[in-house]
Amino acid sequence: MNHLQRRQLFLENLLVGVNSTFHQMQKHSISTCCRSLQRILDHLILLQTTHSPVFRLDRMQLRQMQTLACLWIHRHNHDLQVTLDAIKWISP
């Protein structure tokens, strides 16, 4: 598996993890929800990058995707095609 394939898989897992956690949360205001999602994303990024030098280098870039991920979840939480498009868009 090359770097691009590993990154694609990582981003898919990240979005799936965020989406499943989001569905378990109570849906309060958007600002509260976004703050919670930021913490979830931080945690998932840290878990995925702790033991991997390749992803450790990408950590800062992944953190920059957090706002995008929050917007994506709020607007397209149940749209599979948008999920796939988002994965393609943020994958190099």
From Swiss-Prot:
The keyword Cell division is assigned to this record: no
Major subcellular location class: host cell
Subunit record text: Interacts with NSP2 and NSP5.
Similarity comment text for this entry: Belongs to the rotavirus A NSP6 family.
Lineage: Viruses, Riboviria, Orthornavirae, Duplornaviricota, Resentoviricetes
Subcellular location: Host cytoplasm; Host mitochondrion
Name by which UniProt lists this protein: Non-structural protein 6
Domain of life (superkingdom): Viruses
Any one cellular-component term (Gene Ontology): host cell mitochondrion
